Amino acid sequence: MSYAIIRNEKYTKDEMIQLAPHNERFKKKYSNKNIDLSKTSQNYHLKRPQENSYLKEYQRLIKENNLSQGQLHKNSIYVCEVILTSDNTFFNEIGKIETKRYFEECFKFMTEYKGIGKENILSAVVHLDEETPHMHLVYIPVVNSKDKKGNSIRKISASEFWKGKDSYKK
């Protein structure tokens, strides 16, 4: 029996910058032997970044969505990345059309789950050029909060967004 697999990671600014070359396939060579560059053209986006770097896309979304960053430090979390997949047997059994539908449903689930929202997603790219199909979804963890004056704001906070490991169950 196959299972859906979801992995969530938090990334600092420097780590976020390093995500794009792998996710967006900017490089011509990769240390990951599972990447078959002859199949890279089969990869596709469910949300393509408008900018050519995740940092620029992040900055664009911050401005466009009027998000509050608070005080940033070297180890501040800028984005999270969810990788969604299953096992090879599952994808082989359902075929290409249903595989595409699977990732469309994953995207829909993530945009609606905990209010991630499409507007907070930097990129959602499906990789079909590796051994097992999977989607990388990079997003800004946004929560509704109040500023010091009591005004409602939307701020970036991975710790408040996830509220610890128990919030994954909800």
Describe the role of every protein-language-model region.
Residues 1-170:
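N-terminal nicking endonuclease/strand-transfer module with a His-rich metal-binding environment
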